[in-house]
Amino acid sequence: MAEGKQLPMLRPEKNPGQAPIFQRVGIVGLGLIGGSIALAARQIWPASLVIGVDRKDVLERAMVLHAIDVAADDAVVLADADLVILAAPIQQNLEILRELSENVTGAAVVTDTGSTKRAVVEAAAALPDRLTFIGGHPLGGAARGGIEHARPDMFTGRPWLFTPSKGHDAAALEKLKAFVAGLGAVPQALSPEEHDRLLAFISHLPQLTVSALMHVVGEAARDEGLSLSGRGLQDTTRLASSPADIWKETCATNADEIGSALDALISVLRQLRADLKTGKSIDDVFESANLWRETLLSNKGS
């Protein structure tokens, strides 16, 4: 990030709120997720200092929204932070991690919000002992990104996954769990490997499948054909509006697991293709899909 000049501090009058879990919360990346964390943290723990690091145009919007107390476009402002949240895109988080020990001078808990975990956990292994890294992934979001779409209730009732490494600091994990529970989220812990395997199936595969489906349908049907489509196609392809740049990073950092998930889907599609006339595979796949769909909806309370 450019010049490293701190922007003006902005601390309007606050309500007393809850006693802070962390005193100085540094958030690198004030997009949809980072911005929502900032908004919620300032509401819930007004005695905490929320420090935002991003481009100056983003910081200016964040200050107008009262999402942060201190703004800077350089990570040196994180020197005294006791919690650092890396909420930038995955590759940028990896770059920030490499220099974090130079910017954060004291002891701190460090976490991230990326959708893949093994790469960032491996990179964090090089951090000094005073910086305790525990990977994180809030399973919340919205159709549109950017701090202008951030909401303090973004994480209410949503899972927030943590991926502690072997021999992790149990006290740091408990503080992080308390922090995200304060944001309204439901903290859960699993290994980095299991996280990436599960997310490949429940998130990454659906995204690639929907994007591929919309590509094939659009190329075949064109404008005239799409004008005849019903609500089903719109509902099914909602994820096709997702930005490619974010998903390229996701695929690059979870290629093996996503590849396995794609292989599983391709195998079923081949079954269906080979059995179109008799319909045996269609019966089996539809029956299984109906049952798993009911399970999905019941788990979501729908």
Regions inferred by a protein language model and the residue ranges of each:
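Rossmann-like NAD(P)(H) cofactor-binding subdomain of soluble oxidoreductases
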Residues: I96-A150
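Internal alpha-helical scaffold of NAD(P)-dependent oxidoreductase catalytic cores
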Residues: P152-R238
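Interdomain hinge/lid region at the active-site interface
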Residues: R222-N290
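Glycine-rich, N-terminal phosphate-binding loop of Rossmann-like dinucleotide-binding domains
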Residues: A87-P89, G114, P164
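NAD(P)+-binding Rossmann beta1-loop-alpha1 motif at the extreme N-terminus of oxidoreductases
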Residues: A2-D74, A79
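Rossmann-like NAD(P)-binding element
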Residues: A75-V109
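Residues at the starts of beta-strands that form the adenosine-phosphate
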Residues: R24, L49, T132, P159, ...
